Structure formats: C-alpha cells, structure tokens
C-alpha cells in the first residue's frame, strides 16, 4: 500500500508512474482518494474544535456546581456536542473504509531503476551463466524423460486429482527431496538465513498483507467456510510472521528461508507451459524473505538475488538474470529480477525465481515497523523476497540439461550426498 501522504504531495508523479505500468490502471482513483482524504481532514478539524469546546464546557461544570448554579443548560450543550462528534465519527469511519478500499487496489510505484517497457519482451538481460546446453542428439522434454524413467506420473495424477498435478515416484521423489534439502542447507549454512516451516493455510488478513488480495483472489485456492486460503507461496506466512509488530533496528536485516508446498489456480494460463512440471496447481518451493531498513533494501536485494543464483551455479544449470520492465513488474514489486533457466525442450529460458524489493508497500499493508531505539519513532521496514528456488522447475531443468541419449539422467554432483551417492538415474 502506498503512503497516502506521498500521494497527497506528489499526485501527478504518482499518476505518471501508474500510467507507465503495463496493466491498465484507472488513475482517476488517485483524485478520488485525494477528495476523500480532504473531506476526512476537514471533518477531523471540525471534530477537534468540537472536542476542545466540549472539554472547555465540561471544565466549567464543577465550578458552577460548587457555586450552586444551575448546570442543566451546560450538560445539555455537552450532550449535543457529544452527539455531533459521534455523527462525525460515523462519517469518518465510512470515509476511512472507502479510502482503504481504494488504497488496497493501487499497485506499487516502480523504482527509477526499472526499465521502460510493456511486456516480458522488453525485460533486460543483466547477466548470464554458462552457455545453453548443447546435445549431439535430439533432447527430450522433462515430462517424457520422467515418464520413461518411471519417476514422474502425470497420467495417474490426472486420474486421482486432475490436470497439472504430478506423482513423484521412487528416485523422482528422492530427487525432489534432495533438491529441497540442498537448497535449505545452502541458504541456512552458507547464506545465514533462519529456517521457517510455515502453515500452508493463512487467513484473509495475511493475504491482504502481502498483496495477493484483493487483486488476485481468483488465483487463490480458498477454504470458504473458514475464509482460509492455501498459500500461493511461503512469502505470505513468513512476511506476516511480523504483522502488527515493531522490530528492533539492530535485528535488521532479518533473513528467513522457508520450504513449503504452494497452491495456485493459474487462472488465465491455459496453453502456457501447462505440460510437465513448469506450471502446476501444487508445487514445492524454497522461499527467501528479508526485512530490512529502507537504506539497506537495495543492497540486500542484490545479495538475495546472488543467494538464489548460487544454487543454480552449483547445480551447473545454465541461467540468466533479467531486470523486469515496468509493464511486466506485477502489482507489489518496486523492482524485480527474474532468474531464468535454460530448458532445451523449450529452446528458451524459463523463469525459476523472482527476486523483488517491495520497499514499504507490504509493510504498510501488514503494519510491520521497526525502531532504532526505545525513544525513536517507528518506521516501516522494507520487505524483500525471492524464490531460492522453485523445486519442480529445478527438477525439470536437471532432467533436461543432464539427460543422456540412452534416456538416463546424470545427477548433479552437489545433490549426490542427498541421493545416497547415486550418480545416475536410469
């Protein structure tokens, strides 16, 4: 959520920034929220005058009573003032609700570093690592490799649940578990993150806090009778871990890593990478989340992105890093990098991680603040997160980039200790 004071003081700048985003956004709501804000401040000024008058009148009552004078008129005046204040308070509550409704639907403002552009075609490659894998034979897609090795079963998952679900079997299940363990060990032992095992269901307030609601409710799996949501990413519970709290400045940055299953309806994605492991309704992911001081956040974003890159380098998977343009930025991020791995069957790079700085956008929604010391005024933290990285897509990338002509798959060296020393799946 944006700072209302920032909108008040820089409305034209805010409108221009919102107009430059890819999705269509009706900037007239900025004028609407400013009109409501002005109305609210005018009423607050009137309420302050009435309260001051009521206090003044009230202070006269004991003296007049002591002098034996009739105070009935003053008591009546106090009652009228209280009723008038009560009416204004009711009006203020309605105005606050309208302002909140609008503010929750205004996207974040892109950081000046974000490049211009309308679609993912306009994203800018920052760097890459390793050349795309070359084969002397026709490489197979990971869904065919996994099916032939009897380690992935899409057909039976379709029978048991539906499309875009998968059974991992035998060494496939072990490979998935190995990747999870390797990622968690790397981020905790080498990069200094504290591990969190979060709930897989959250309440509506949590989804609002990280920006999934109200905009993306159609993409969420909801348990209607309890108003719970299956998490689309561990970012939601881990960020909300500190909702409505004031952190200590000397604790920042706080760094958490969390493994979780993730659940997404992927509404509107029909026909886009829907075969195999790339776009599933349920998938596993290791998430990196940081809480920082504002002046630290962009340095910490670079570190977080490098942490996510490390596991791809150690796995030996070709990848590139792209800076996301304004039109492809999404609702909550101020600046975002995507890590994309090379997928031979697609003959292109496929996103495996998004690393974002939300600045204070989520912190305002979730009311997460910090204080430098006991006497300092609380300030909003900056929140960051990135996949460290998606598990299913990592498995897919391993199967495709490490395949052999005979259909076997070489296991990356860093995963072999987690696979009982096994070197090949065949």
Swiss-Prot record:
<dbReference type="InterPro" id="IPR033729">
    <property type="entry name" value="SerRS_core"/>
</dbReference>
<keyword id="KW-0030">Aminoacyl-tRNA synthetase</keyword>
<dbReference type="InterPro" id="IPR045864">
    <property type="entry name" value="aa-tRNA-synth_II/BPL/LPL"/>
</dbReference>
<dbReference type="InterPro" id="IPR002317">
    <property type="entry name" value="Ser-tRNA-ligase_type_1"/>
</dbReference>
<dbReference type="GO" id="GO:0005524">
    <property type="term" value="F:ATP binding"/>
</dbReference>
<dbReference type="GO" id="GO:0005737">
    <property type="term" value="C:cytoplasm"/>
</dbReference>
<protein>
    <recommendedName>
        <fullName>Serine--tRNA ligase</fullName>
        <ecNumber>6.1.1.11</ecNumber>
    </recommendedName>
</protein>
<comment type="subunit">
    <text>Homodimer. The tRNA molecule binds across the dimer.</text>
</comment>
<dbReference type="InterPro" id="IPR010978">
    <property type="entry name" value="tRNA-bd_arm"/>
</dbReference>
<feature type="binding site">
    <location>
        <begin position="233"/>
        <end position="235"/>
    </location>
    <ligand>
        <name>L-serine</name>
    </ligand>
</feature>
<comment type="function">
    <text>Catalyzes the attachment of serine to tRNA(Ser). Is also able to aminoacylate tRNA(Sec) with serine, to form the misacylated tRNA L-seryl-tRNA(Sec), which will be further converted into selenocysteinyl-tRNA(Sec).</text>
</comment>
<dbReference type="Pfam" id="PF02403">
    <property type="entry name" value="Seryl_tRNA_N"/>
</dbReference>
<dbReference type="GO" id="GO:0016740">
    <property type="term" value="F:transferase activity"/>
</dbReference>
<feature type="binding site">
    <location>
        <begin position="351"/>
        <end position="354"/>
    </location>
    <ligand>
        <name>ATP</name>
    </ligand>
</feature>
<comment type="pathway">
    <text>Aminoacyl-tRNA biosynthesis; selenocysteinyl-tRNA(Sec) biosynthesis; L-seryl-tRNA(Sec) from L-serine and tRNA(Sec): step 1/1.</text>
</comment>
<dbReference type="GO" id="GO:0140096">
    <property type="term" value="F:catalytic activity, acting on a protein"/>
</dbReference>
<dbReference type="GO" id="GO:0016260">
    <property type="term" value="P:selenocysteine biosynthetic process"/>
</dbReference>
<dbReference type="InterPro" id="IPR015866">
    <property type="entry name" value="Ser-tRNA-synth_1_N"/>
</dbReference>
<keyword id="KW-0963">Cytoplasm</keyword>
<feature type="binding site">
    <location>
        <begin position="264"/>
        <end position="266"/>
    </location>
    <ligand>
        <name>ATP</name>
    </ligand>
</feature>
<keyword id="KW-0547">Nucleotide-binding</keyword>
<feature type="binding site">
    <location>
        <position position="287"/>
    </location>
    <ligand>
        <name>L-serine</name>
    </ligand>
</feature>
<keyword id="KW-0436">Ligase</keyword>
<keyword id="KW-0067">ATP-binding</keyword>
<dbReference type="GO" id="GO:0006434">
    <property type="term" value="P:seryl-tRNA aminoacylation"/>
</dbReference>
<dbReference type="InterPro" id="IPR002314">
    <property type="entry name" value="aa-tRNA-synt_IIb"/>
</dbReference>
<dbReference type="InterPro" id="IPR006195">
    <property type="entry name" value="aa-tRNA-synth_II"/>
</dbReference>
<comment type="similarity">
    <text>Belongs to the class-II aminoacyl-tRNA synthetase family. Type-1 seryl-tRNA synthetase subfamily.</text>
</comment>
<dbReference type="GO" id="GO:0004828">
    <property type="term" value="F:serine-tRNA ligase activity"/>
</dbReference>
<dbReference type="InterPro" id="IPR042103">
    <property type="entry name" value="SerRS_1_N_sf"/>
</dbReference>
<feature type="binding site">
    <location>
        <position position="387"/>
    </location>
    <ligand>
        <name>L-serine</name>
    </ligand>
</feature>
<keyword id="KW-0648">Protein biosynthesis</keyword>
<dbReference type="Pfam" id="PF00587">
    <property type="entry name" value="tRNA-synt_2b"/>
</dbReference>
């Amino acid at each position: 959520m944006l700072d209302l004071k920032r909108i008040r003081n820089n409305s034209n700048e805010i409108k221009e920034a919102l107009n430059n985003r890819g999705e269509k956004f009706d900037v007239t709501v900025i004028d609407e929220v400013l009109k409501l804000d002005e109305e609210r401040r005018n009423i607050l000024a009137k309420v302050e005058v009435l309260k001051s008058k009521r206090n003044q009148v009230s202070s006269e009552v004991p003296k007049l009573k002591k002098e034996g004078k009739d105070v009935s008129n003053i008591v009546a005046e106090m009652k009228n003032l209280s009723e008038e204040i009560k009416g204004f308070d009711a009006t203020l509550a309605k105005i606050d609700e309208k302002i909140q409704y609008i503010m929750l639907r205004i996207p974040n403002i892109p950081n000046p570093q974000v490049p211009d552009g309308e679609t993912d075609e306009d994203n800018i490659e920052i760097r890459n690592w390793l050349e795309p894998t070359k084969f002397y034979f026709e490489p197979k897609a990971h869904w065919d490799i996994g099916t032939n090795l009897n380690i992935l079963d899409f057909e039976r998952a379709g029978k048991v649940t539906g499309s875009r679900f998968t059974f991992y079997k035998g060494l496939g299940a072990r490979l998935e578990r190995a990747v999870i363990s390797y990622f968690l060990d790397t981020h905790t032992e080498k990069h200094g993150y504290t591990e969190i095992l979060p709930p897989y269901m959250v309440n509506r307030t949590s989804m609002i806090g990280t920006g999934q609601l109200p905009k993306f409710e159609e993409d969420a799996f909801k348990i209607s009778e309890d108003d719970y949501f299956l998490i689309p990413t561990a970012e939601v519970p881990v960020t909300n871990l500190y909702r409505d709290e004031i952190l200590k400045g000397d604790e920042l940055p706080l760094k958490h890593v969390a493994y979780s299953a993730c659940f997404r309806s992927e509404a509107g994605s029909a026909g886009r990478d829907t075969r195999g492991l790339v776009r599933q309704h349920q998938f596993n992911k290791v998430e990196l989340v940081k809480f920082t001081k504002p002046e630290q956040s962009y340095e910490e974003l670079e570190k977080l992105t490098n942490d996510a890159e490390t596991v791809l380098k150690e796995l030996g998977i070709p990848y590139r890093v792209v800076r996301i343009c304004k039109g492809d930025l999404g609702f909550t991020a101020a600046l975002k990098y995507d890590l994309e791995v090379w997928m031979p069957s697609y003959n292109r790079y496929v996103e495996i991680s998004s690393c974002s700085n939300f600045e204070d956008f989520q912190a305002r929604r979730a009311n997460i603040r910090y204080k430098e010391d006991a006497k300092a005024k609380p300030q909003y933290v900056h929140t960051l997160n990135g996949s460290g990285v998606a598990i299913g897509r990592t498995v897919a990338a391993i199967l495709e980039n490490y395949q052999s002509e005979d259909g076997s798959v070489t296991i990356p060296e860093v995963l072999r200790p987690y696979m009982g020393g096994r070197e090949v799946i065949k």
